[in-house]
Amino acid sequence: MVVKVKQKIPLKIKRMGINGEGIGFYQKTLVFVPGALKGENIFCQITAVKRNFAEAKLLTVNKASKNRVKPACSVYETCGGCQIMHLAYPKQLDFKDDVIRQALKKFKPTGYEQFEIRPTLGMKKPDHYRAKLQFQLRSFGGTVKAGLFSQGSHRLVPIDNCLVQDQLTQDIINKITQLVDKYKLPIYNERKIAGIRTIMVRKAQASDQVQIIVVSSKEVRLANFIGELTKAFPQVKTVALNSNRSKSSEIYGDETEILWGQEAIHEEVLDYGFALSPRAFYQLNPQQTEVLYGEVVKALDVGSKDHIIDAYCGVGSIGFAFAGKVKSVRGMDIIPEAIEDAQKNAKAMGFDNAYYEAGKAEDIIPKWYKQGYRADAIIVDPPRTGLDDKLLKTILHYQPKQMVYVSCNTSTLARDLVQLTKVYDVHYIQSVDMFPHTARTEAVVKLQKRV
């Protein structure tokens, strides 16, 4: 390795990496530079030297890309929540197409060079789209601040005006910090592991109803806090307390208690409504969720005799799009509260052909097959870690005729396709921009069992 830490070097950026960083070569050494764009000539300083590459921080842009824009966010460079706000939005969509191609080229699933990769479906107004926030609380000189940890650190960046966050949720978290200060509520201390760690605020787009989770490592008295908050924001319908006494970086503990208000808020997608409890998973971008689920519906060709498995089903929202036209829908999720929501939602909509069970997909699906259930199609919407090996083996063993893979991580998607393409043909990959200004890429993959 010819470069050293703190060394300053000129660099020509050849391409962009999957995390939104610029990539160039310095005397045959691969260098990753966050904030740099393809085609730019820059000056940077080496911050880390690894076995096969180096990392650097951008110092100056000597020749800027015509696609570079000035981020409107005042904490963009320190926050780390967004990675590509300095790239013009139409080019962000092109970047996400390329991220998929890079992942496929790295893992090389069967036939990947012939896969149809459709242009990413973007937003008309790619700002204030996040309907949910999870901000950390810390004390700064005796004043409470809420925000996000800077990339790769435990240093909190206070945020009072996030440009990708729904404005109501931002207004509410700003009020919460004032009230935590006012009522002298205990703030988390990493040394003592005590106090309020995190605040979750989520808004349902259809109803404007809001739910809040206070994550704390100790008991806190919130009666006055709740009274003043709900008076200021009548949209708040639920306040819950989650107990997390763990030393780990996990946001939530296992126990969540409704302190005030209703058990769930009302949301809608694709013309059907459903209940959403505080701990249940739902997509962060309601506008693009309509687009994403619409693409899932397009990708499956099913009828009245077909049976569908909706793995990682959450509150059942994807499966409900099919329940009215198929023989049966079965779903599972590891969060019991989500399954309770799914069961209640199915009953409320009159879907007596929908069945939901709490647990891991890799455990429940083999059990269903042993009981004689046979799925004609399966929908998987796994976390960023991708499909569990046991679930992959189960799918390859039972081989449903159709499959839709909804991915939030192109690397694990490409990895899983290496196994799935042993049995299935990939008809196309359709990316949907769920997270503008970030490097995160969401994609819907249509797969058909090979004849």
Swiss-Prot record:
UniProt keyword annotations, A-Z: 4Fe-4S, Iron, Iron-sulfur, Metal-binding, Methyltransferase, S-adenosyl-L-methionine, Transferase
Gene3D superfamilies: 2.40.50.1070, Nucleic acid-binding proteins (2.40.50.140), Vaccinia Virus protein VP39 (3.40.50.150)
Active site: C408
Binding positions for [4Fe-4S] cluster per the UniProt entry: C73, C79, C82, C162
Any GO BP annotation: rRNA base methylation
TRAM domain sequence ranges: 2-60
Cysteines joined through disulfide linkages: none
Enzyme Commission designation: 2.1.1.-
Keyword Zinc-finger belongs to the record: no
SUPFAM superfamilies hit by this protein: Nucleic acid-binding proteins (SSF50249), S-adenosyl-L-methionine-dependent methyltransferases (SSF53335)
Class in the EC hierarchy, top level: transferase
Residues bound to S-adenosyl-L-methionine: Q283, Y312, D333, D381
Family classification: Belongs to the class I-like SAM-binding methyltransferase superfamily. RNA M5U methyltransferase family.
Name of the protein described by the UniProt record: Uncharacterized RNA methyltransferase SpyM3_1299
Species this chain originates from: Streptococcus pyogenes serotype M3 (strain ATCC BAA-595 / MGAS315)
